[in-house]
């Protein structure tokens, strides 16, 4: 006989969510694979036109006309659907936090078509749009199934996970991204549904693009232990450069707002500036995966590496600041690869065997992304899956940890959270539904909730703690129920109050804040 006050977790609930996750993953895999394929084909075509224009300049005039028309078209899309601006990841985070509301179908088709800005050669990535496309599909599935708000958010999460998985053939990174970057917690139903969706979407993507890893660099030798000390120095460099990236990216509106153009036509700037870049250096166009892949065959001269880094840093900022649909994942990884190649070449001058330069390319990609996104687990696993090698988990972890600490000491914040805060400050279309909803709140090791009775905590108003998920059990709560580390608190509230209540519980349960009150 079961203990009083406990509800047995039925296996069919998990199966129910797994099946929904598979459904979302299948649709997302198809849509994102078509999106990715369209961008690649368009990118190849654009590069070939620039190559031809060197001998027949009339083609450059044609490209200029196409860029102007594309800027008009994408600007019109952004004007009618502002939620497709940028990578889309801050919008998804805001949606899951209950701070933004979106029309999933409008976002889906306009974001897909708006991807022309990525295919046109701008220094933007496909991963952010892929995540938002997946999230839109998840939201649509939730409405199709007439799911309650809390279940719809799980499906949105699974869509985001499967979007990243299909974009990079990285299902584990897709799962970790949702848990580490978006939810900042571990919820059994979220990870189970998201994992099912990510695996399914990745299978579809592999069918389209084959089994070869996206950034396969060939055989990568294991880095000898004697070079691990140099990883600390590399981590410091990555942390500092990541902090600079954050500051410059967040300062871009100060530049664009001075232009005599409406915000939705800021894309004219990158669309016009891409013309001389495409004419002079067509191989540098796009998110940068071709540059990373080039390191698998040969090492570039240091002066060329520095030139490429400056070019890609500056124009990736200009591209993203224009408010066009496009992400920063791949551009960040490309910049990290250039930093790693530069550092590896310096190490060769100090006597290191050149065969290890590729190791530093891989390590720096993860470290630089960690410094900017403040999501080390996602960065490590993402790079591991993209290069197809498990030989570098230890050096990846070391460099990522140092880069994270250095960026933290400098005062850097996770870039997507900063972008979301800016979006919420400027967003005029955000709408709160005001519907009843539940959300999960984890009890962590650094929380004062650990070991506390429910009645002894000063809970916010307008909420109800309805149950606690502990392992596979769901416990109905009462005043004497003791909360423990690892518990997931299931809280009922109105969606309009959700962000405030989350923040209030976090503030009141923080050990740091508790100590400061004494």
Regions found by a protein language model. Give the residues of each.
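Alpha-helical transmembrane segments and immediately membrane-proximal extracytoplasmic
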Residues: 1-424, 428, 444-445, 470-473, ...
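A short, polar/charged loop/turn motif at coil->beta-strand junctions and beta-hairpin connectors
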Residues: 86, 112, 435, 459-462
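A structural signal for short secondary-structure junctions
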Residues: 361, 372-373, 433-435, 459-460, ...
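Long, charged amphipathic helices and adjacent flexible linkers at domain junctions
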Residues: 415-438, 510-518
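Short, glycine/charged-rich beta-strand-loop motifs at protein surfaces that mediate ligand recognition
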Residues: 439-443
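Cytosolic Rossmann-like ligand/nucleotide-binding regulatory domains
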Residues: 444-501
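Short, compositionally biased
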Residues: 480-481, 501-518
């Amino acid at each position: 006989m079961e203990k009083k006050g406990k509800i047995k977790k039925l296996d069919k609930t998990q199966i129910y969510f797994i099946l929904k996750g598979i459904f979302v993953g299948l649709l997302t895999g198809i849509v994102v694979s078509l999106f990715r394929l369209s961008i690649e084909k368009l990118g190849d075509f654009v590069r070939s036109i620039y190559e031809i224009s060197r001998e027949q300049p009339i083609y450059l005039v044609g490209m200029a006309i196409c860029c102007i028309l594309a800027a008009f078209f994408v600007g019109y899309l952004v004007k009618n659907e502002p939620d497709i601006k940028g990578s889309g990841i801050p919008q998804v985070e805001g949606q899951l936090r209950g701070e933004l509301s979106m029309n999933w179908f409008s976002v889906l088709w306009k974001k897909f078509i708006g991807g022309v800005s990525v295919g046109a050669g701008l220094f933007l990535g496909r991963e952010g749009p892929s995540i938002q496309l997946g999230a839109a599909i998840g939201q649509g599935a939730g409405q199709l199934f007439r799911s309650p708000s809390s279940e719809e958010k799980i499906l949105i999460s699974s869509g985001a996970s499967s979007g990243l998985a299909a974009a990079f053939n990285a299902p584990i990174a897709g799962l970790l991204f949702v848990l580490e970057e978006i939810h900042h917690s571990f919820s059994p139903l979220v990870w189970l549904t998201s994992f099912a969706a990510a695996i399914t979407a990745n299978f579809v993507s592999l069918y389209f693009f084959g089994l070869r890893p996206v950034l396969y660099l060939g055989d990568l030798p294991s880095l000898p232990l004697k070079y691990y000390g140099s990883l600390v120095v590399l981590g410091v460099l990555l942390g500092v450069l990541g902090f600079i990236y954050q500051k410059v990216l967040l300062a871009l509106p100060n530049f664009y707002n001075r232009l005599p153009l409406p915000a939705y036509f800021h894309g004219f700037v990158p669309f016009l500036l891409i013309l001389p870049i495409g004419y002079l250096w067509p191989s540098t166009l796009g998110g940068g995966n071709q540059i990373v892949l080039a390191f698998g065959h040969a090492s570039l001269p240091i002066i060329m590496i520095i030139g490429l880094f400056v070019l890609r840093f500056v124009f990736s900022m200009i591209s993203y600041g224009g408010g066009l649909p496009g992400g920063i994942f791949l551009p960040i990884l490309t910049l990290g690869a250039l930093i790693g190649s530069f550092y590896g070449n310096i190490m060769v001058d100090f006597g290191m065997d050149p065969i290890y330069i590729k190791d530093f390319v891989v390590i720096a990609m993860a470290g630089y992304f960690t410094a900017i996104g403040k999501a080390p687990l996602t960065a490590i696993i993402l790079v591991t899956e993209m290069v197809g090698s498990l030989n570098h988990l230890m050096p990846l972890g070391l460099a990522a940890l140092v880069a994270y600490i250095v960026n933290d000491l400098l005062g850097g914040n996770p870039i997507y959270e900063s972008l979301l805060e800016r979006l919420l400050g400027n967003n005029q279309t955000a709408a709160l539904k005001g519907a009843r909803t539940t959300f999960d709140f984890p009890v962590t090791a650094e929380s004062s909730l650990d070991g506390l009775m429910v009645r002894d905590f000063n809970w916010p108003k307008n909420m109800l703690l309805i149950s606690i998920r502990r392992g596979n059990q769901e416990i109905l709560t009462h005043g004497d129920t003791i909360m423990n580390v690892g518990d997931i608190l299931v809280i009922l509230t109105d969606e309009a109050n959700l962000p405030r209540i989350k923040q209030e519980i976090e503030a009141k349960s923080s050990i740091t804040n508790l100590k400061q009150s004494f």
